[in-house]
Amino acid sequence: MKILSGREKAEQDLKQLKKELDELNLNRPIKLAIIQVGDKMESNRYVEQKLKKAKEIGIEAKCFKFDENITQKRLLLAMDEINENWDGILIQLPLPKHLPKEVILDAVPYEKDIDGLSHRNEFILYNEKNSDDKFFVPAAARAVLELIEHHEINYKKKKVAVVGRSHLVGKPVAHILKRRGASVSTFDENTPIKLVASADIVIVAIGVPKYIKAENIKQGAIIIDVGTNYDQNDPSVIFGDVDHESVKTKASAITPVPGGVGPLTVVCLLKNLVEIYK
């Protein structure tokens, strides 16, 4: 079974991105603001990775961390101030349940919405033939697509199953692959999982540990596991959304967790940020 690593490409792309930044010859560093509400361990880890990689290539990045119980009104007021002074703005998800996610995401100015999750950005992404406006592909979705291209996975006229319909991964990946010539079917927890078994390529981003097992895939299937799930008893242990031990006798190739889509996601976020200036 071939391992579809994303680490090497992530490091190469980060070096290339630094070179592009240097060539832009800006009179100040590009500035990235990360807005985090609460203190979830998983969110803290993701934020640390983003801050670290941004610093490596000369981007000025800062996390604005707010109390878990902050009101919608106070958060939006704080965001108004942040919007004035930062080039790219990212809302670290998930948000606490009392905050309406769509309202908070739409409070990020469209041109600074580097994770591409505002309604306006999504409208342009899914209707791009009718618009000349610039849009951002959500970083995790872009990472999946770039990893597929990097490993020269042929998806045109192939059956592709996208398990998970989130705005972060499943929905944009399915839309773009379909537009590029793949035969795409989408699934969620309410869809009969047995239908995945006919797919040549299975992309899994459903947020459920070890959701896909050997009996759910065909012999020789290529698996892209986007899931990152931390063991509650041992936070150093990470599971994907695929049971890797189970599928290893049937899959022809799979992305590792960690080390597959994850490293590329951070780099793709920074690519979106730098593209503001291109």
From Swiss-Prot:
One annotated Gene Ontology cellular component of this protein: cytosol
Binding site for NADP(+): 164-166, 228
Gene Ontology process terms (BP): L-histidine biosynthetic process; methionine biosynthetic process; purine nucleotide biosynthetic process; tetrahydrofolate interconversion
E.C. numbers: 1.5.1.5, 3.5.4.9
Chain's role: Catalyzes the oxidation of 5,10-methylenetetrahydrofolate to 5,10-methenyltetrahydrofolate and then the hydrolysis of 5,10-methenyltetrahydrofolate to 10-formyltetrahydrofolate.
CDD domains (UniProt xref): NAD_bind_m-THF_DH_Cyclohyd
Catalysis: reaction(s): (6R)-5,10-methylene-5,6,7,8-tetrahydrofolate + NADP(+) = (6R)-5,10-methenyltetrahydrofolate + NADPH; (6R)-5,10-methenyltetrahydrofolate + H2O = (6R)-10-formyltetrahydrofolate + H(+)
Gene: folD
Domain of life of the source: Bacteria
Alphabetical UniProt keywords: Amino-acid biosynthesis, Histidine biosynthesis, Hydrolase, Methionine biosynthesis, Multifunctional enzyme, NADP, One-carbon metabolism, Oxidoreductase, Purine biosynthesis
Quaternary organization: Homodimer.
Pfam family, one: THF_DHG_CYH
Name of the molecule in the record: Bifunctional protein FolD
Species lineage: Bacteria, Bacillati, Mycoplasmatota, Mycoplasmoidales, Metamycoplasmataceae
Molecular function via GO: methenyltetrahydrofolate cyclohydrolase activity; methylenetetrahydrofolate dehydrogenase (NADP+) activity
Biochemical pathway: One-carbon metabolism; tetrahydrofolate interconversion
